[in-house]
A protein has these predicted regions:
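Glycine-rich phosphate/diphosphate-binding loop of Rossmann-like nucleotide-binding domains
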Residues: 131-198
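Adenosine-phosphate binding glycine-rich loop
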Residues: 20-29, 226-320
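Short, aromatic/basic amphipathic alpha-helical patches
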Residues: 103-112, 175-179, 226-230
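Rossmann-like adenosine-cofactor binding region
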Residues: 178-249
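Structural motif
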Residues: 7-12, 61-63, 93-96, 144-146, ...
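N-terminal Rossmann-like NAD(P) cofactor-binding subdomain of oxidoreductases
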Residues: 94-102, 113-116, 168, 173, ...
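Glycine/serine-rich phosphate-binding loop and adjoining beta1-alpha1 elements at the start
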Residues: 45-46, 50-136, 253-267, 271, ...
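N-terminal, charge-rich interaction modules
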Residues: 1-31, 38-41
Length: 320
């Protein structure tokens, strides 16, 4: 049976405490320990599509600031997490695991199986959300975070599909012959749809959004610095509906909720290593700073064949 691992880290003290509950580690639960010891890493849950694929989620109880401030330590903990996962054919990366240490490249050099960052799946889900929200010609789409791997792939694909774009990357805007500006307020002005494609948020005032605008967001925390104004909508840009055969058990259900998935959906980045092992690809869908559109499309084909689909999921603002 194909098997994958998905690595995550604690997004805050509550998540670190939850990892302590799952691993029966009172030091983490009561916040005596900071999650920096390799022995604090633990299995969070098992996931599966019976008869098709098995997966294991491994929790690294380092907070975002810990991941960013000491990336060599973060890399070593990710290596330990892969070792804990056991026999797997691919490794996926969640949140800042996909950003630190060369966006997966340093980890790929240290382990013997493909490492995929989730960027192709995230980009695919964002594009599908835009397509279900706005038709080409109905107004411009703003892409915040267009200089990053996900934002660039989204912008290039939307341009191919005929959407008018406004980007926060002047360089990419020039190459696509579209509007670009460093001022985020200028970028989102007049846009009925805004894509928040950066890995981290807290960069845009909610007052800058047009009345009735839809923010399709994947940033953690949210792209905006506060809750959206009345009439505006935020969609979870990575949310995918689960196939009927998806199995997760008790701890998998707990993980779904604490990770922000909810009971009825998963995030696309988790599905990326799943699709990788099911398709028996030897190369990742995404690694490093670039997402190839062909790889994004290949992920979409596999995910769709397994009954994963984009779910238009309104969510509340999630700040720090």
């Amino acid at each position: 049976m194909p098997r994958f691992a998905f690595l995550v880290h604690a997004l805050g003290p509550v998540h670190r405490g939850a990892i302590g509950v799952r691993s029966f580690n009172p030091g983490l639960f009561f916040q005596w320990r900071k999650g920096q010891d390799p022995n604090d890493i633990s299995v969070l849950c098992d996931l599966s599509i019976p008869g098709v694929v098995d997966g294991v989620v491994i929790g690294i109880p380092l907070l975002p600031e810990d991941m960013l401030s000491d990336q060599e330590r973060a890399l070593e903990r990710m290596v330990s997490a892969v070792e804990l996962a056991g026999d797997v054919q691919a490794v996926g990366l969640g949140s800042l695991c996909a950003v630190v240490a060369g966006r997966g490249e340093a980890l790929a050099d240290r382990v013997s199986v493909p490492v995929t960052t989730g960027a192709a799946a995230t980009a695919w889900a964002l594009v599908e959300n835009v397509k279900s929200t706005l038709q080409p010609g109905q107004g411009p789409v703003a892409v915040v975070g267009a200089a990053g791997p996900v934002g660039r792939a989204v912008a290039v694909r939307l341009k191919e599909l005929g959407y008018a774009l406004q980007l926060d990357s002047r360089r990419l805007a020039r190459s696509l012959d579209t509007m670009g500006d460093r001022s985020l307020e200028s970028v989102v002005a007049g846009c009925p749809v805004v894509v928040g494609a950066g890995p981290t948020g807290g960069v845009l005032s909610p007052l800058a959004l047009e009345d009735g605008a839809t923010l399709i967001d994947v940033a953690i925390p949210s792209t905006t610095t506060g809750p959206l104004q009345s009439g505006c909508t935020m969609l979870a840009g990575e949310a995918l509906s689960m196939p009927p055969s998806w199995k997760r058990g008790f701890w998998g259900s707990v993980y779904h909720v604490l990770a922000g998935y909810g009971f009825q959906q998963v995030l696309a980045c988790l599905v990326e290593p799943l699709a990788l092992v099911v398709s028996q690809r030897s190369q990742p869908f995404a690694l490093g700073r670039k997402v190839e559109l062909a790889d994004m499309d290949a992920f979409g084909e596999v995910a769709t064949s397994l009954d994963f689909s984009v779910k238009r999921l309104p969510v509340r603002w999630h700040g720090r």
